[in-house]
Amino acid sequence: MKVMVVDDSNTIRKTVETILNKNGCEVITAVDGYDALSKIADSKPDLIFIDIMMPRLDGYQTCALVKNNPEFSGTPVVMLSSKDGLFDKAKGRIVGSDQYLTKPFSKDELLEVFEQYRA
């Protein structure tokens, strides 16, 4: 399974990449929305984790662009955020996210979400 992790935090990217690699995933990382959009067409991930708070192109905008592309509209997107408010979760749903994972998350929480989308 190919999973993309989009986060401006190197620590989050590396942590998620390590956990998912150990679970048999091919992981593609991106530092922001622009980086992600340039890699999505080539890598065609099966699942995308996107941080909300990023410079240049935030997670909401990135998710909306992914979901509005017919080729990737069916690709599950999980939003990552340190914000746990109803407004933030609702905004994620409006732009098309499938799920919301609040940081800091545990390895078990990450794997629980991952397993829901595993092919």
Feature map (PLM): residue ranges:
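Active-site beta3 strand of CheY-like receiver
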Residues: 43-49
